[in-house]
A protein has these predicted regions:
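Domain-level signal for soluble alpha/beta catalytic cores
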Residues: 1-190
Length: 190
């Protein structure tokens, strides 16, 4: 939705764009599965942008309009992976950008938890939690079913290692919202 000015040169409606995105992802998933892939991580920058405080300006809408955009994003994602082989593990990494050790967006997951965590049909989420710009763990309470959560607690933006006890305590803090046996640890960029 935020690139519509340029996209409208090639498409008459946003629905047509969404349909082509779905087709493209389905073809890609079919091809990589045929090549032997059984674990697919989709890096999705859209959700990271939606939680940013500048999202209404970026998307050219109001906060209420962002609700419609979240539903559109969810619809495209779920349609894109619909019909994927049952033995293909599909995960979403909510990417906030990591170009030259900086980032493109900030914001807690609270505003997308009800849509993304509760309704996206994936096996796991890779989520950035390496600094305060990602907010707290409470939104993880919305993670539905048996989905796994990979906590990106280890930063790639600094050569300084995290304190082991701090990392352990943050994992236990996240376990208040998602059972410990469904939590995993990774660098913030998945």
């Amino acid at each position: 939705p935020f690139a519509w000015e340029n996209t409208s040169k090639y498409y008459d409606t946003q629905k047509q764009v969404a349909e082509d995105i779905v087709k493209g992802y389905r073809a890609f998933i079919k091809d990589i599965y045929a090549a032997g892939c059984r674990n697919l991580q989709l890096d999705d920058c859209s959700w990271g942008m939606v939680v940013d405080s500048s999202a209404p300006v970026l998307f050219g809408t109001t906060k209420a309009g962002l609700e419609k955009i979240k539903e559109q994003l969810l619809d495209v994602n779920n349609k894109a992976i619909e019909g994927a082989p049952k033995d293909l593990v599909i995960n979403t990494h909510v990417c906030r950008g990591n170009f030259h050790s900086t980032y493109a967006s900030s914001g807690a997951y609270d505003s997308v938890a009800e849509t993304l965590f509760a309704k996206e049909n994936v096996n796991a989420y890779y989520l950035e939690f390496d600094d305060e710009r990602s907010g707290g763990f409470a939104p993880l309470a919305k993670v539905s079913g048996e989905k796994k959560v990979v906590l990106g607690l280890i930063t790639t933006k600094s050569p300084v290692l995290e304190d082991k006890q701090v990392v352990i305590s943050r994992i236990y803090e996240a376990a208040k919202y998602v059972p410990l046996d469904r939590l995993y640890l990774s660098p913030q960029c998945g």
